[in-house]
Amino acid sequence: MKQKFKRAILYARQHRANQEVNESLHRLVDFLSTQDIEIFQDSDTAASFELKAPVLPREKMGAKHDLIIVVGGDGSLLSASRMAIKVNTPVIGINRGRLGFLTDILPQDIESHLGPVLNGQYNEEERFLLHTKIYDKENSYFEGDALNDVVLGRGSETHLIEFDVYINQQLVSHYRSDGMILSTPTGSTAYALSAGGPIMHPQLNAIVLVPMFSHSLSSRPLVIDGEAEIELYISKSNETDLRISCDGHESRVVKPGQKVAVKKNGNRLRLLHPLDYHYYDTLRSKLGWESKHQG
């Protein structure tokens, strides 16, 4: 039997404030009230929803028996992950989004699937995040974390951008493209997949670099060691500013001549699943793959 939980922190993003999310949050409160669980909400949740639960400041999260319950889609869980790794608190998701690669529990299954989890019946896996720094000469002026991907892209202009990629201080290539996606295995079924990247099992210790519309027929996705340190040097020949984004949320300007450094974050996300969760079932369901022919 694994760890049982005594406190639940409900998390929902402000811009996901719709009736469906609201219904699931209230259903959670009603259910958790019957399970001898202390119920709290995050400050983001309290800003958009009226729940009968006190706000737990983030600096007070991280007790041994805490569990963060995310209501929303994968984007909501991505946002919660950056909070969760700082307090080493496990996360589980109620899917109120579209695909739901990370949010396992369907709204109608809250009681039947979450109940066993609260009592220690679950699978736990660790997912790593990428930590990004932007440097102006020797000083960094931005740091961000991404569970899915870090994306270097064009600003407001529509022409190709130029940059050099180094791995462990060794030059890989000079690129002329629309940008570059640096993805974790978790993010390999997200934006990187749309750009032609491979699907990687989430327990792989690897990072994939996926060029976006490269001006070279030989430019292909590159899978590298997860411990590698990646540097993107922005060419001074770029006539406009570029942008770096972490999981599509945190976005910052990168100027010609600057450097972006990306490596694995030392903290891991503790992601929980119900006992009947299977990764390949999720892939088959979410991506519309065929099941075994019956007949």
Swiss-Prot record:
The active site is at D74 (proton acceptor). Its EC number is 2.7.1.23. It comes from the Bacteria. One of its GO terms (molecular function) is NAD binding. Keywords: ATP-binding, Cytoplasm, Kinase, NAD, NADP, Nucleotide-binding, Transferase. It is found in: Cytoplasm. NAD(+) binds at D74, G75, N148, D149, H159, R176, D178, T189, A190, Y191, A192, L193, S194. One of its GO terms (biological process) is NADP biosynthetic process. It is an enzyme of class 2 (transferase). Gene3D superfamilies: Probable inorganic polyphosphate/atp-NAD kinase, domain 1 (3.40.50.10330), Probable inorganic polyphosphate/atp-NAD kinase, domain 2 (2.60.200.30). GO terms for cellular component: cytoplasm. It catalyses: NAD(+) + ATP = ADP + NADP(+) + H(+). Its cofactor is a divalent metal cation. Belongs to the NAD kinase family. NCBIfam families: PRK01231.1. HAMAP family: NAD_kinase (MF_00361). Involved in the regulation of the intracellular balance of NAD and NADP, and is a key enzyme in the biosynthesis of NADP. Catalyzes specifically the phosphorylation on 2'-hydroxyl of the adenosine moiety of NAD to yield NADP. PANTHER family: NAD KINASE. This is NAD kinase. It comes from Legionella pneumophila subsp. pneumophila (strain Philadelphia 1 / ATCC 33152 / DSM 7513). The lineage of its organism: Bacteria, Pseudomonadati, Pseudomonadota, Gammaproteobacteria, Legionellales.
